[in-house]
Amino acid sequence: LICIDGGRVDRAKNSSIIQNFRKENSIFFSQSITYAPYTNSALHALISGAYGNRTGCNSYWHSREFNHNKFKTIVDYLHENNYYTCADVPTNLIMPKQNYDEYYVSDESSIDLKTHHYELLCKMKKLVDSKQKIFLHLHYSGIHEGIRDTVLKKFTNYSKEFFENRKQNEERYDALFTDAEKYLEYIHEKLDELNLWENSIIIVFSDHGMSLGEKFGERAYGALCYESTINTFYSYFSSDLKHKEITSQVRSVDFMPTILEHLGIKLDTNFEPLDGVSLFPLINDQNPKENFAYTETGNPLDSKIPPKKPNTKSIRTSEWKLIVNEHNDTKELYDLKNDPLEENNLINTGLEIESILWEEFLKIQEKSVIN
């Protein structure tokens, strides 16, 4: 797994580096909805295949509340199946340490991340050559750190100066994204050099997107549930796949069961069922039904820190989205097909889809645990 922290899907679509990342055997998912528009809950949902409202990791504050007694992660499954597991992350809050053989916390501002990740790839190569199966998570946080230093430390979610300078915001982000592309290009070269493509599943993805000032009230990510931060990308490589782009809506929680099916590993029925489903019916053009995608986050509003429980939530299909703002008891309904910028709120206009989405929203709330 190679995470590009804060990578926007629109930039990924237009990136020759990402689009050509072993393109002939890669499937590009261009509408993958994250459970949370911030890293720790997003990644916990990815590796467990379950939403944080059920696992316990539903806010910035609750990484340690992830319920390992009821939910297994992909790392747990792989460790049980004799994979050597290794991760490199910017903080130990974004990924549980359980069942990792090696777990590194790296500050990108103080080390050469490319060199460090190359060293890890070399270590994995030695294991592979000795017939040891491996799992490696690499985390590129350059975009996040750049936005942290130039946006989060300088502006608030209500700074007019930020929202009135969209061009500057775009240029700032694009410079950071270009650096991420250079990192990926380097990793691609090293995977070639080490011959690590064969018999591998390699996924390049973003945990969440990034606001560039599209919606007042969110200067980066983690406050709202609009497309700029919750719509992400996944590029899924395996030599037994043929290239295609899948534009249908999928969810980040779908990739854990997809990987397990690909590896022939069965789900453990002694644990809670997943929210995610395998994407192979979709990959194999079997026209499966579309699943609702759920996202939630904690809008800090006027506070300098996020709340300890989510207060902004959304439920959606590929064409419609219902946003529930619990902090002020309001709702928003958007026709994503005809209003992709989410500018025309259709709530309380008598549309049947509103009640359908609301019923699904309530079903998900009933499953929530209380931290």
Specify the residue positions occupied by each region the protein language model found:
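Catalytic domains that recognize anionic headgroups
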Residues: 1-371
